[in-house]
Amino acid sequence: IGEPPATRGYTPSVFAMLPRLLERAGTSEKGSITGIYTVLVDGDDMNEPIADAVRSILDGHIVLSRRIAAQNHFPAIDVLGSVSRVMYEVVDKSHLAAAQEMRQLMAVYAEAEDLIHIGAYVKGSSPKIDAAIQKIDGINAFLCQDIYEVTSYEETEKRLLAAVGKTAEPTAPAAEPADAEAAS
């Protein structure tokens, strides 16, 4: 008759096949393959079994949000819902620190957003919320890009640093390749 359904109607073999399918991309003795996969989740539920399984396998994921798109913010990337497990290997320390600070500011703002919008937040109550309020417009401007806008990596990094109130300082990569292997 076949396999019995397990998680939300998906059979166990689906979850067994995902790593084999997704890990075909990668490095081998013959070269490397980069894969960009698209996963449409049921009802925008990021904890849906397939989405959850795929996120656990991949080195990172970019979450697109209908809510952000409805605000005419493009690309409609949910930064707080997106993750890169290799970022520390490919950016320098100042870039990594700025990206982490931006995520923290966005998270603080998201936590307090309802209070801010209804006027219940009193300025000075929390230095973290005050900093997030001060920088959120610059962060959102940094995260918006016109469909025809082309920005170099260097310009993007400069704008990221400016969005969180930092200046560029040349530094070493956040992690040396040997450090990255030891960390995994």
Q: Locations of the language-model features?
A:
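P-loop NTPase catalytic core
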Residues: 1-184
